[in-house]
Regions:
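Basic, amphipathic alpha-helical/coil surface patches used to engage anionic, phosphate-bearing ligands
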Residues: 1-352
Length: 352
């Protein structure tokens, strides 16, 4: 075989490969990058499972509520012992995220945290029409959620607090009663209470009363308002940092004045009334609010995200009804004194 033939054959064999080297290569599609909001949602979901605060908030927790690893573990052990030995508590959650609700609210005063746990379990037993059967698939509850009456906003405020928006005009008082309203609130609260960031930083409430009618006011008796506010203030492990009311009609003003008069002085100082949304936006960044209030994300999108979260945690919400306490036995119980008697060793641990 001549050298010319060999060269020709080699060229014919190599040419296709050579051509492929110069052809544009097919790009491998990249997995979609997460937005900052999506990344934060994943982080918060992991924190919720463990009860652990993110690194950037641990120093603040140490300063504000004396939280350190040794103190936290000792306090959790004390609360679990309290529950185990309590003659009136038949069943209760004992996981860290649940118990940390009470410890962080009471800044690691174990006796106060245990006392609040007693009250919390008791109120669920005494007022089941308000605090039990928190099922997102219940037709009435699902309809109220879908209407957008109560929505925790995806983004936190400037202080890092979870913001809960209520829109009274989206609750139909001709179809639903105060029990449905209370159960919707209880369900949303339970969904949020296990968030470590919120246990430390607290909550901001924005209540838009536009569309409020007299039937809304008549849903609640003065007695029920008094009882509910007592439950919220003294039995719910939730740090209420700021409450905004906006667009309150003249016939609703007296109702809210009465309600605010029942609050502790500390909570009274955290209530603000605004004439309109523009005034509200001076205190709450409109960027975190729904598009209808000056933000960028439509309220409908926020509602759909809430519905997904509620379904994800539905079993947890329903399992709350398995907790049980003998309310009558609570009055005869003196085990809280045992917690007080061990508080000295807890304080010693704080100082060591």
């Amino acid at each position: 075989m001549t050298s010319n033939v060999r060269t020709k054959m080699a060229t014919s064999v190599l040419q296709p490969e050579s051509r492929r080297e110069h052809e544009p290569k097919a790009e491998i599609p990249e997995s979609p990058r997460l937005t900052d909001d999506e990344r934060m949602a994943i982080l918060e979901a992991k924190e919720r499972e463990t009860g652990e605060l993110p690194a950037e908030l641990r120093e603040r927790a140490r300063i504000e509520m004396r939280e350190e690893p040794a103190i936290r573990e000792h306090a959790l052990a004390q609360m679990r012992h309290f529950i185990e030995k309590h003659p009136a508590i038949k069943k209760s959650r004992t996981d860290a995220p649940f118990l940390l609700r009470f410890l962080r609210t009471k800044k690691y005063s174990v006796p106060q945290a245990c006392a609040m746990l007693e009250r919390y379990l008791s109120l669920r037993q005494v007022h089941p029409h308000w605090f039990q059967k928190l099922d997102p698939l219940d037709p009435k509850i699902a309809a109220v959620i879908d209407a957008g009456y109560l929505v925790p906003l995806p983004k936190r405020d400037a202080e890092g607090r979870r913001v809960v928006l209520s829109c009274m005009g989206r609750f139909d008082p001709y179809v639903y009663d105060s029990c449905v309203m209370a159960r919707v609130h209880s369900m949303i609260v339970e969904l949020l209470l296990d968030e470590p960031r919120s246990q430390l930083l607290g909550y901001t409430h924005v209540n838009d009363e536009a569309g409020m009618q007299m039937p809304h006011v008549s849903l609640w008796s003065f007695n029920d308002v008094r009882t509910m506010l007592n439950c919220i203030q003294n039995s719910t492990p939730m740090r209420h940092k700021c409450t905004h009311f906006v667009n309150v009609p003249h016939y609703g003003a007296k109702f809210f004045e009465f309600a605010v008069s029942l609050l502790s002085d500390k909570l009274k100082d955290r209530v603000m009334f605004h004439r309109n949304t523009q005034d509200l936006n001076k205190h709450v960044d409109p960027a975190i609010l729904p598009k209808e209030y000056g933000g960028t994300v439509p309220l409908r999108d926020m509602i759909e995200e809430l519905k997904r979260k509620l379904l994800k945690h539905r079993e947890e919400l329903l399992a709350l009804d398995e907790m049980c306490v003998d309310v009558n036995a609570l009055e005869k119980n003196d085990i809280t004194q045992d917690v007080h008697s061990t508080a000295g060793s807890f304080r010693k641990l704080e100082l060591d």
